[in-house]
């Protein structure tokens, strides 16, 4: 009888302490996530010091760009590759050719995950790769015959952090002013038009620096956790290869009216544009001044848009 009582007491104690232990562990993971965002923020600031501008999210033309600029259609490596030297990853950076398409980079390079780019509440680097896949493309031959050909779509390492591309105020309706075209983003890490210097070195045209953040670097997000539902982890377009400039949602997100912060189990699991986390009730961000904050998921979308827009003239009240 006494043994049964002891077992019952032990069971009660375990039931009492297990939730507390889980909360402590999640708190530690959330802090680690903030530290990783802080590292990304520092690396981006060092990039700014070196280049007098923040890194472009990707190289991407305007809708009405010249033929020469249209050649650069976003398939060069993303901004996460550009900041590698400032994260003590010079050797990894040296494996990349920023002037060449992502699909031509070595497989071992595009598949290399980094712990600094994953949230510990969501996964480890062992679960941070989107596999290659095949897609059927409809083609028409010279004889007028139709058919399909299968092409290989290159996968690669995935991550949990995305640059702040701004809000949707420029539009997202297929117009030339849409946010995803080069130079149109209202955030800090935005798609930029490519250009070549006199020595034919590939660089970017739309350069965002601290002077281009009139709302203040402490009021404007630099990067944050990207939303992805558990069932969409490591799948395109929800959580595709983060180094691939064609996969904008894999490394840059927007926030504001129409694009709220989302949690792990929110019903809008198909949302591919916005920020969100698997931490209970909050999403972690690093701001342009290097500070980190956990923003309440209940933050209204107007305030979120003010946080994401670098020049809307507002001062957001952040919960």
What residue spans do the PLM features occupy?
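N-terminal single-pass transmembrane signal-anchor helix
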Residues: 1-29, 39
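Surface-exposed loop/linker segments characteristic of extracytoplasmic
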Residues: 12, 27-319
């Amino acid at each position: 009888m006494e043994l049964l009582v002891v077992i019952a007491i032990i069971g009660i104690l375990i039931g009492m302490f297990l939730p507390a232990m889980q909360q402590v562990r999640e708190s530690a993971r959330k802090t680690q996530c903030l530290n990783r965002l802080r590292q990304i923020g520092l690396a981006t600031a060092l990039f700014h010091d070196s280049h007098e501008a923040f890194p472009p999210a990707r190289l991407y033309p305007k809708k009405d760009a010249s033929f020469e600029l249209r050649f650069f259609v976003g398939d060069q490596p993303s901004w996460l590759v550009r900041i590698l030297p400032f994260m003590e990853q010079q050797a990894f950076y040296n494996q990349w050719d920023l002037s060449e398409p992502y699909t031509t980079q070595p497989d071992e390079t595009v598949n290399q995950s980094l712990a600094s780019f994953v949230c510990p509440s969501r996964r480890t680097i062992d679960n941070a790769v989107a596999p290659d896949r095949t897609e059927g493309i409809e083609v028409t031959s010279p004889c007028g015959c139709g058919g399909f050909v299968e092409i290989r779509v290159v996968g690669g390492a995935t991550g949990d952090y995305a640059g702040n591309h701004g809000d949707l105020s420029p539009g997202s309706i297929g117009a030339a002013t849409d946010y995803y075209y080069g130079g149109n983003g209202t955030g800090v890490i935005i798609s930029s038009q490519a250009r070549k210097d006199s020595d034919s070195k590939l660089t970017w045209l739309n350069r965002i620096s601290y002077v281009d953040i009139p709302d203040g670097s402490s009021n404007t997000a630099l990067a944050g956790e990207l939303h992805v539902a558990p069932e969409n982890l490591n799948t395109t377009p929800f959580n595709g290869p983060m180094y691939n400039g064609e996969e904008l949602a894999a490394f840059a997100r927007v926030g504001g009216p129409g694009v709220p912060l989302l949690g792990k189990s929110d019903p809008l699991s198909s949302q591919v544009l916005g920020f969100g986390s698997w931490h209970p009730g909050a999403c972690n961000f690093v701001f342009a001044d290097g500070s980190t904050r956990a923003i309440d998921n209940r933050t209204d979308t107007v305030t979120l848009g003010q946080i994401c827009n670098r020049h809307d003239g507002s001062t957001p009240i952040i919960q």
